[in-house]
């Protein structure tokens, strides 16, 4: 062919705005085009002459060093095949040709370079596609996709089962550097692995933890965060992933809700539907026997060298939505992924993906790590009394609780700023034949019922303490008889973190009462002075854990239970306008009163929003008892649209107090 007649590509327009809108990727803050696999995108190609029937246009899509590339030529067929990459002419006008390209629904995800007849057409990112029915992350409901893929804000649910608190969280999966960071975390995967949401999600989960190959977050539960950021300070995944991307170093520090928030962000960023999930009264079984063993002395104090298991007030992980083509049928849908460094799986700290369907049925052999998650949501709690007998210890089982683990499993409701209870997705109703059958299937043995003959039953009514006020407990004792009986009650109260880590014992309350009738209430009280001066001993939010033992004097029968009390603190008041303009100052006015009898130290108020470039803060060293402070924080919105502003208050003694408001930012 005469070189003067050779077909030459002069330019390629990736039609970023048009394609991004069609692929639901217009919010990504990147100069590169972001596409979803299995869906048509358009290219506008300028040639040196009109395209003729004998001409060839060859497109090469390359995913990087040592990675395969796809070569696609013009297809004369007008219809698209069911599989593979394809390219067709959509429109031709003189030297301008519009091409429609469709990637394979199981294509490698990641960063691509593209060449058209050796012309460098640029770079784009290819994501998983929940809108594509042939993609293994397909999600049928548009409302679900809007929530689990596109929503960049949400809530974490914290506290404990009887006193659930919501914590606003900014996922920010579209923000600058986030997508780059997520794909850089996956550079160690083989091409075939980058096709699978199962393997990609497991790899992302692994790389969230700094203990695994310099991953994103350093876990810290010591209460000393002096060389980093305290976990409770974070309210967004964005600064964490941005810092990791820029520095290539692990970010200090995280706890379970931070790990969950960042993992949810990363999964949504690469196109895998995801949600942060909270399990209240979450078991941590160190012996893999599907139960938690707690050992008490005769006053109700825990015995640390024997009590290796723990029950967390709450624990958070992330659910990801996908087909499980690597498993038998019936395990598609939500999968548990947990990047909090608790357990080793195949040599690294990670959990999952574990099918929620398998967890519910007790199918603990199903991959990955289903035994651990099953115990978290459906384990049993054994309480042992350790008795000293002639210098020897004797362990006596005094309580078996089959319904106290895995309460109020929660996530944000689709399309609403409310909590959704999804407990029955993870387990059958407590006490039902199906629930006990799942436990039997998981453990391989029938449940222990040797304590069912007990005549005395114990429970506790309270679930909170107003900070600065006495601890008041009401113990409820139930019997089948109305005969008067003397009962010894011993209640040990600890100050501990949400993971069950005991920081100090506040004291033991002991009382002997005569109970009459089939139900009796016994009041116990401890003055606030026993705890108020210990709140700042560690830089963590603290709760009160109580272990109560009741003994019938005549028969010696003992029963036990435990309770968790959270501290309540009155919120501060915040004023901000309902509307504001981009690039103009917005003023937030705060009013706060210290209602405690002790000074509050290391005061910090902060404002975060996806409408701001940076977090804004106001700090003060000390607020004396009874003192009221008023101040203003000024910030400048840089993005239009409805933007949620989160104002947080923290101090050494009081944590996790916040207010929020949506402000409409206009041009």
UniProtKB/Swiss-Prot annotation:
The gene is Tgm4. It is found in: Secreted; Cell membrane. Homodimer. Induction: Androgen dependent, as shown by the decrease in the level of the protein following castration. Associated with the mammalian reproductive process. Plays an important role in the formation of the seminal coagulum through the cross-linking of specific proteins present in the seminal plasma. Transglutaminase is also required to stabilize the copulatory plug. One of its GO terms (biological process) is mating plug formation. Its cofactor is Ca(2+). It catalyses: L-glutaminyl-[protein] + L-lysyl-[protein] = [protein]-L-lysyl-N(6)-5-L-glutamyl-[protein] + NH4(+). Its EC number is 2.3.2.13. Binds 1 Ca(2+) ion per subunit. Disulfide bonds: none annotated. The lineage of its organism: Eukaryota, Metazoa, Chordata, Craniata, Vertebrata. Glycans are attached at residues 151, 220, 227, 408, 472, 488. It is a lipid-anchor; GPI-anchor. This is Protein-glutamine gamma-glutamyltransferase 4. SUPFAM superfamilies: Cysteine proteinases (SSF54001), E set domains (SSF81296), Transglutaminase, two C-terminal domains (SSF49309). It holds the Pfam family Transglut_core. The keyword Chloroplast does not apply. It comes from Rattus norvegicus. Belongs to the transglutaminase superfamily. Transglutaminase family.
């Amino acid at each position: 062919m005469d070189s003067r007649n050779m077909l030459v590509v002069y330019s390629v327009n990736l039609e970023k705005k048009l394609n991004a809108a069609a692929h639901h990727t217009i919010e990504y803050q990147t100069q590169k085009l972001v596409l979803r696999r299995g869906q048509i995108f358009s290219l506008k190609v300028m040639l040196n002459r009109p395209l003729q029937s004998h001409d060839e246009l060859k497109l090469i899509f390359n995913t990087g060093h040592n990675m395969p590339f796809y070569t696609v030529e013009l297809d004369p067929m007008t219809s698209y095949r069911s599989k593979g990459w394809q390219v067709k002419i959509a429109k031709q006008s003189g030297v301008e040709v519009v091409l429609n390209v469709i990637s394979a629904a199981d294509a490698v995800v990641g960063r691509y370079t593209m060449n058209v007849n050796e012309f460098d057409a640029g770079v784009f990112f290819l994501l998983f596609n929940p809108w594509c029915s042939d993609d293994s992350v397909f999600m049928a409901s548009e409302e679900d996709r809007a929530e689990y893929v596109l929503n960049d804000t949400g809530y974490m649910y914290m506290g404990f089962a009887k006193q659930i608190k919501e914590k606003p969280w900014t996922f920010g999966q579209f923000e600058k550097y986030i997508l780059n960071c997520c794909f850089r975390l996956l550079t160690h995967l083989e091409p075939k692995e980058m096709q699978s949401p199962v393997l990609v999600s497991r790899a992302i989960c692994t790389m969230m933890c700094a203990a695994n190959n310099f991953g994103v977050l350093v876990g810290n539960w010591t209460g000393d965060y002096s060389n980093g950021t305290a976990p409770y300070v974070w309210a967004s995944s964005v600064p964490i992933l941005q810092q990791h991307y820029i520095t290539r170093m692990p970010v200090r520090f995280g706890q379970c809700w931070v790990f969950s928030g960042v993992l949810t962000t990363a999964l949504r960023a690469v196109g895998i539907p995801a949600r942060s999930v909270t399990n209240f009264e979450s078991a941590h079984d160190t012996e893999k026997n599907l139960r938690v063993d707690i050992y008490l002395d005769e006053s109700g104090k825990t015995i640390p060298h024997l009590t290796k298991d723990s029950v967390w007030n709450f624990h958070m992980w992330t659910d990801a939505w996908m087909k499980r083509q690597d498993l038998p049928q019936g395990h598609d849908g939500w999968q548990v992924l947990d990047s909090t460094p608790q357990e080793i799986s195949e040599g690294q700290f990670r959990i999952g993906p574990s099918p929620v369907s398998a967890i519910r049925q007790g199918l603990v052999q199903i991959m990955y790590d289903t035994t651990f998650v099953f115990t978290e949501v459906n384990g049993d709690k054994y309480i042992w009394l350790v008795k000293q007998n002639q210098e020897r210890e004797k362990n006596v089982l005094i309580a078996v609780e089959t319904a106290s683990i895995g309460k109020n499993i929660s996530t944000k409701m689709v399309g609403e700023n409310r909590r959704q209870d999804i407990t029955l997705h993870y387990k059958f109703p407590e006490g039902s034949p199906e629930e006990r059958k799942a436990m039997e299937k998981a453990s391989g043995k029938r449940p222990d019922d040797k304590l069912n003959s007990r005549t005395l039953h114990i429970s506790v009514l309270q679930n909170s303490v107003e900070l600065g006020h006495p601890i008041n407990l009401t113990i409820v004792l139930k019997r089948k008889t109305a005969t008067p009986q003397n009962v010894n009650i011993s209640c040990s109260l600890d100050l501990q973190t949400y993971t069950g880590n005991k920081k100090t014992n506040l004291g033991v309350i002991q009382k002997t009462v005569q109970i009459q009738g089939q139900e009796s209430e016994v009041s116990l009280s401890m003055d606030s002075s026993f705890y108020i001066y210990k709140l700042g001993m560690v830089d963590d939010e603290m709760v009160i854990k109580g272990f109560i033992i009741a003994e019938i004097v005549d028969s010696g029968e003992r029963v036990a239970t435990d309770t968790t009390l959270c501290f309540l603190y009155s919120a501060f008041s915040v004023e901000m306008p309902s509307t504001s303009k981009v690039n103009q100052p917005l003023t937030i006015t705060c009013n706060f009163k210290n209602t405690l009898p002790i000074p509050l130290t290391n005061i910090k108020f902060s404002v975060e929003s996806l409408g701001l470039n940076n977090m804004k803060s106001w700090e003060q060293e000390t607020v004396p008892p009874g003192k009221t402070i008023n101040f203003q924080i000024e910030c400048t919105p840089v993005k239009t649209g409805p933007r949620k502003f989160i104002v947080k208050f923290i101090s050494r003694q009081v944590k996790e107090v916040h207010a929020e408001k949506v402000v409409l930012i206009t041009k």
